[in-house]
Structures are given as structure tokens and as C-alpha cells.
């Protein structure tokens, strides 16, 4: 893991003392080792440059203070980007929804090996999960439209919830039906922030 590259691109790391930086580096190195060893047996991701994925997952923290959220939900967590690493930095209690068996097994392995007590893994699609709860923060880097993502989360948010969606070049087309939102850009990434209190019933369309 090229930790120097992370420090050069993630400004918030400047606020970490040496002890916390050392602890973070150890966990990221452990993740990298497990990612490659697990990946040799199970094809869970095509990522080759993990540093790029980490920067993409965490760069939003250079622009927005997300430290006040007590709990969060992530949709389609895959190999853990972004929520696993947001949980590592923010200490927010995150529930990761990942229906793919191999990917869910990897996330559970990471949770165990890294001692991430603030991370829970659910091997199920969020819309099929019956024990609904209100999340203060909902994140996703999944490749589905913003309206569909919001619709799938019906029952998991209230007026105090903030959606953080990691989107690409087509984001403005996806957001045509949304009256209020905020976009922060870095490189080719568009970080979309939507306050649930600004949503209407028309946004709860799982088939959008």
C-alpha cells in the first residue's frame, strides 16, 4: 500500500497524529494483503490500484464533515468501497448490504481480521431486509440510478438522513427529478449529497 500517495491526496490525514497514522496504515496494509490473497481464490473485484479506490472513497472527507453521523447504511458494498473505509475513519456504525456470497464473505473476513466492531455485514439486498431501521447516512457507489437507489432505501431513512452517492458523468441526467441536491467534484467523480427531507414520493421508485 502506497501510504505516501494517500497522504498526498487526502488532506484530512494531516489532522492525524503519528500514532493514528501508524494504526491506519497497519489496517490498510492488512486489507490489501487479504484483498489479494482472497482474490486469488475468489474473483471479487477487478481493482488493481487500491490507492485510487481509497482516494475515491475518502476524498469527500476533504470537503464535507461527516463525523457527526452515528450510523450508516451502504448499498452494494462489493469489496468495501466506500463505506468500509468511511467506517474506519469516521467510527460511524455502518451496515453493509452485499447480496453476493463471495463479496459478503470477504467483507466479513475484513471485519473480523481488522477488528472493525462498528461494521456489520448483511448478505442480502437492502429491499429484502425486513428489520428496517433509520440510518443517518446512506452511501453507495453502486452502478444504478439515483432514483432507484433512493427507492430501494424506503423504510431506512427519515427527514434527518443524508444520502451520499458516488456518481459519474451521467449524474445530472439522473438528478433531473430532484429539486435540491449538492454535488462536489473530484477528478471524474461526482459526490452527490441529498437530504432526505427534500425528497418527494415520486423519488421512491424502485424501478426508475
Model-derived segments and spans:
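Short coil/turn segments at beta-strand junctions that form active-site/ligand-binding loops
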Residues: 68-70, 92, 133-134
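Class I SAM-dependent transferase core
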Residues: 2-73, 102-105, 109-119
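Class I SAM-dependent methyltransferase "Motif I" SAM/SAH-binding loop
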Residues: 73-79
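S-adenosylmethionine
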Residues: 85, 95, 99-208
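Conserved SAM-binding loop of SAM-dependent methyltransferases across substrates and taxa
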Residues: 79-91
Amino acid at each position: 500500500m502506497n501510504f505516501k500517495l494517500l497522504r498526498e491526496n487526502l488532506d484530512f490525514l494531516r489532522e492525524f497524529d503519528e500514532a493514528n497514522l501508524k494504526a491506519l496504515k497497519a489496517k490498510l496494509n492488512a486489507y490489501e494483503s487479504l484483498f489479494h490473497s482472497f482474490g486469488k481464490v475468489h474473483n471479487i473485484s477487478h481493482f488493481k490500484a487500491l490507492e485510487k479506490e481509497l482516494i475515491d472513497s475518502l476524498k469527500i472527507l476533504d470537503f464535507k464533515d461527516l463525523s457527526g453521523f452515528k450510523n450508516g447504511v451502504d448499498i452494494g458494498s462489493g469489496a468495501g468501497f466506500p463505506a468500509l473505509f468511511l467506517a474506519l475513519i469516521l467510527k460511524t456504525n455502518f451496515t453493509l448490504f452485499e447480496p453476493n456470497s463471495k463479496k459478503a464473505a470477504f467483507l466479513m473476513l475484513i471485519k473480523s481480521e481488522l477488528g472493525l466492531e462498528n461494521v456489520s455485514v448483511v448478505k442480502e439486498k437492502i429491499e429484502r431486509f425486513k428489520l428496517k431501521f433509520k440510518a443517518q447516512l446512506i452511501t453507495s457507489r453502486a452502478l444504478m440510478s439515483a432514483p432507484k437507489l433512493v427507492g430501494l432505501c424506503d423504510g431506512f431513512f427519515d427527514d434527518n438522513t443524508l444520502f451520499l452517492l458516488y456518481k459519474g458523468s451521467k449524474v445530472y441526467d439522473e438528478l433531473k427529478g430532484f429539486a435540491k441536491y449538492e454535488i462536489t467534484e473530484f477528478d471524474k467523480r461526482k459526490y452527490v449529497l441529498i437530504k432526505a427531507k427534500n425528497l418527494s414520493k415520486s423519488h421512491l421508485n424502485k424501478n426508475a
